């Protein structure tokens, strides 16, 4: 959110197409069409809106001169963003080359975010890839364009060194973002996995959150040493919402409403026109066609995410194909 023009931005990467953003002054209303960022190569773009009205975009990019010294050698770069022209301007500058400890040849410095906290600028990035070596590292500087110095106790979040046989393990933790509550507390949201049998991850990457601590020398961190990422975080004064769909629960959808519930998902984009709740009341009718899941199109496919390692589900299906393509 940019308070200077009262505008919300969502910026991301469409792999194979490029980086783009959409914007609005009402997040519950209409958003703009995608606005491409052709000068921004690489992935994982993130906006930073400074107190002086200037804006910046940071992201993961290639090694200097596109000449990597090893596999996974990447950089974090920054460029000023013109909020009036909706485009990046000026030179692209390298903020981080390789990672927090270049001598160790770290891989995949990515997912950067810029913050200004208590007069200091912080650059936070994921490092180590998204598997078991996943982590988060932090740098501090005097301006959005650097120079940034890594914290001596990086990483600020990881579970890579812990015993794989520990109970209720959380693994692959990284790609974090920071948020401050109205009360002034800092929290982190990040990606991690809950493996089954300490090996497999049938739930994929999930979103976690935990409170942020601050070091004596003024750096934020989530874990140090053998600190565990908790499966459940309890906060004083906050009552658990028993109606939420976590823990053991049962649900049934009779498809008797006017719209699908928020838990239902489609592939790539909304499947508008490919399903109906009114054609046969009490049923979800899929309008099959010849689109396969491997094509860059929207198939007649509706699903919901797995939330547990073990579960049971069933559905009643009436299927009368009219052609081989169905």
Residue ranges and their predicted role:
Residues 1-326:
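Carbohydrate-active catalytic/glycan-binding domains of CAZyme proteins
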């Amino acid at each position: 959110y940019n308070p200077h023009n009262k505008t919300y931005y969502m910026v991301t990467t469409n792999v194979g197409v490029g980086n783009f953003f959409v914007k609005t002054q009402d997040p519950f209303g209409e958003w703009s069409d995608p606005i491409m960022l052709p000068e921004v190569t690489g992935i994982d773009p993130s906006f930073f809106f400074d107190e002086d009205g200037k804006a910046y975009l940071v992201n993961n990019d290639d090694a200097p001169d596109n000449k990597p010294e090893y596999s996974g050698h990447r950089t974090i770069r920054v460029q000023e963003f013109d909020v009036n022209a909706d485009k990046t301007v000026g030179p692209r500058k390298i903020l981080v080359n390789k990672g927090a400890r270049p001598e160790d040849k770290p891989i995949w410095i990515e997912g950067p975010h810029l913050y200004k906290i208590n007069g200091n600028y912080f650059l936070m990035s994921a490092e180590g890839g998204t598997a078991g070596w996943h982590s988060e590292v932090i740098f501090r500087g005097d301006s959005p364009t650097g120079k940034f110095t890594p914290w001596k106790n990086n990483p600020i979040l990881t579970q890579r060194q812990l015993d794989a046989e520990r109970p209720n393990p959380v693994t692959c933790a990284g790609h974090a973002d920071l948020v401050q509550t109205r009360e002034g507390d800092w929290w982190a949201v990040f990606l991690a996995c809950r493996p089954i049998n300490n090996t497999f991850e049938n739930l994929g990457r999930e979103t976690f959150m935990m409170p942020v601590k601050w070091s004596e020398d003024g750096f934020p961190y989530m874990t140090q040493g053998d600190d565990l990422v908790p499966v459940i975080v309890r906060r004083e004064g906050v009552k658990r919402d028993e109606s939420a769909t976590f823990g053991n629960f049962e649900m049934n959808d009779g498809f008797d409403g006017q719209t699908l519930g928020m838990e239902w998902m489609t592939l790539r984009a909304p499947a508008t026109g490919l399903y109906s709740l009114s054609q046969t009341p009490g049923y979800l009718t899929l309008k099959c066609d010849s689109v396969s899941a491997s094509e860059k199109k929207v198939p007649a496919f509706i699903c919901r995410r797995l939330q547990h390692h073990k579960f049971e589900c069933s559905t009643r299906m009436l299927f009368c194909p009219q052609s081989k393509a169905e």
